Every structure is written in C-alpha cells, then in structure tokens.
C-alpha cells in the first residue's frame, strides 16, 4: 500500500500499471480499479478481464478510460468535444465518443475522462496510455469509500492500493454521450452540464 501521493508514488503506481498489474487508485470522485487500457498492452496483459473478474462485471459493460490531458482524446477519436464541455476538464466529467480506426473497426465508442486530480494525471502520463477506471465494489454492491473497507475486501485480488483517505459522500463523474453535434447526459454526477 502507498500512503503518500507524490512524484515517487506516481512513478511506482505507473510501473505497476505498465506491467499489467491491477491497482486501486484514488480519483477525483471515488476509488477505482485501474489497469492499462492501451489496446495492444491490454490484450497482452488482459487487464480488462482481470478487473471484470474482481468486480464480477459482465463483459458488455465497458470501463471508463482516464487520460492525462484533454488533448490525448484526439489520438483515439476524431470527435471534437464541445467547448462548453471541454471547459469542465480536467474534472469529473466523462464523455463517450466514437473511436477512430485502427482502434475500432466497428462503430464502437469509449468513455474518456481527464481527472481533476493532478497526481492521477501524472500516473497516467507516466504510463503513456489511458488507464481503465471503474468504481471499487462488486457489481451490484455499494461503492467502497474507505481504504479500510477496500483493503479488507480486495487486498488479495489487487496488486497495489494507494491510500488518499476516505471518499465518503463523493459523487461519481457525470457521463455525457456525444453524438450528431450534440450531447445527452446519461448520468448526472458531480459536474453540472
């Protein structure tokens, strides 16, 4: 377990992620299970499947991908984020955009968020790729908001836990689907749009 969010701990967390490990990381909303999300590395390490197994989450429900800067999304999607939404970043706003080739051959979409937490953005930047993030809980159960609860339930199933204190009462991110030049709020969270 890491108890300090600093430059060294960001490097350590990134090293775990780059090796295909699953980490519990604090975000600007709640604690999240995280793993490397870059397509070729994810396939090599199976991070998606590892997180799904821990959570008991069905395969058709995708994970949010966290990016280190809003500009990073242009690597994966040609969709332009409307200025009114872009102004909310970094922060607890998740946008769902279509993926471009070669990341998707079908009309697939992905949910991206640029978190407000600078330490977490440094971890992601150190990885060099987006990372998955999904709330720390078993599917269908309440989100765990304290490291004590997380450690008790998941310490034998994850490779690293970063302690940033309790996240009691934290709201999840707001999720917005972008399409046809407009957007639709799918989940109202801590950011008002």
Which residues make up each language-model segment?
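Active-site-adjacent structural elements in enzyme catalytic cores
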Residues: 1-193
């Amino acid at each position: 377990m890491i108890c300090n969010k600093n430059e060294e701990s960001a490097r350590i967390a990134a090293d775990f992620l780059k090796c295909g490990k699953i980490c519990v990381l604090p975000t600007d909303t709640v604690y999240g299970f995280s793993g490397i999300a870059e397509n070729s590395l994810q396939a090599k390490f199976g991070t998606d499947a590892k997180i799904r197994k821990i959570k008991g989450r069905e395969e058709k429900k995708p994970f949010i991908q966290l990016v280190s800067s809003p500009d990073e999304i242009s690597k994966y999607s040609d969709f332009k984020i409307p200025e009114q939404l872009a102004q909310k970043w970094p922060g607890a706003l998740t946008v769902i955009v279509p993926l471009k080739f070669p990341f998707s051959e079908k009309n697939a979409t992905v949910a991206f968020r640029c978190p407000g937490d600078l330490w977490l953005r440094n971890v992601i930047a150190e990885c060099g790729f987006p990372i998955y993030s999904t709330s720390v809980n078993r599917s269908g159960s309440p989100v765990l908001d304290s490291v004590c609860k997380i450690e008790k339930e998941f310490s034998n199933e994850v490779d690293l836990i970063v302690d940033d204190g309790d996240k009691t009462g934290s709201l999840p991110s707001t999720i917005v689907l972008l399409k046809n030049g407009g957007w639709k709020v799918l989940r109202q969270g801590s950011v008002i749009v």
